[in-house]
């Protein structure tokens, strides 16, 4: 049951009563019921501190209820309505988390599961948006208590997106689509230069250019690799 048994009793509820009931549902993990109660609170008492807190917790409840689009919409609304609120950093954080989780399923699959050709456009977009959300949080609120976690997630996202380029480049190599493989690997080097993916990206470029008989480009990639990764096990695999 999403709402208390006797809905008509809510006619007499104060803002505090709505809030405490919603918070109880939230704490119990009944997120859909909490969202309804926060909505009722805001409809009845749209102004003031409690309504603002309800808006913020609505974003959190949607996030916990696996409704990333609704969580992002609620967080965006809070940021727009209350840009100088003392807890507005949390809205930025929830927005980033919602996009992060939206991209996480595909990321985990790419990192651990069978080879996929590519990240879907949606997952790639969610990763990029999550990165931008966290970047905005740490730029605007460097002292925020959420900033350290945001920075860690940014580092993870960059590595994961770079690795997705490598997975795709490997796929193209297996298909003997050497130009596509070289382009993907080159993109990983250019866009994500300080990630673990760079080492293998250079190796793929060397292989692809060799197959294409583009020897100058092959030699350039190998030179960069020997300078930056002199102990790379990939170098041992080169002819």
What are these regions (language model features)?
Residues 1-239:
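Acidic, polar-rich low-complexity tracts and alpha-helical solenoid repeat scaffolds
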């Amino acid at each position: 049951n999403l709402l208390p048994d006797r809905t008509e009793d809510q006619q007499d509820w104060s803002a505090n009563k709505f809030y405490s009931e919603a918070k109880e549902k939230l704490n119990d993990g009944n997120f859909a019921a909490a969202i309804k109660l926060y909505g009722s609170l805001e409809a009845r008492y749209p102004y003031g501190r409690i309504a603002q807190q309800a808006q913020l917790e609505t974003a959190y409840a949607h996030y916990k209820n696996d409704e990333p689009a609704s969580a992002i919409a609620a967080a965006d609304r809070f940021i727009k309505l209350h840009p100088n609120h003392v807890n507005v950093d949390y809205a930025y954080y929830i927005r980033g988390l919602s996009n992060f989780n939206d991209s996480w399923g595909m990321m985990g699959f790419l990192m651990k599961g069978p080879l996929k050709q590519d990240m879907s456009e949606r997952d790639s977009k969610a990763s990029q948006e999550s990165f931008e959300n966290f970047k905005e949080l740490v730029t605007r609120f460097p002292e925020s208590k959420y900033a350290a976690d945001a920075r860690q997630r940014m580092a993870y996202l960059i590595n994961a997106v770079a690795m997705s380029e490598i997975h795709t480049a490997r796929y193209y190599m297996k298909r003997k689509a050497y130009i596509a493989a070289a382009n993907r690997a080159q993109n990983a080097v250019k866009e994500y230069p300080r990630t673990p993916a760079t080492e293998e990206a250079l190796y793929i470029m060397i292989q692809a250019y060799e197959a294409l008989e583009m020897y100058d480009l092959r030699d350039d990639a190998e030179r960069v690799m020997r300078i930056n990764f002199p102990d790379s096990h990939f170098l041992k695999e080169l002819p």
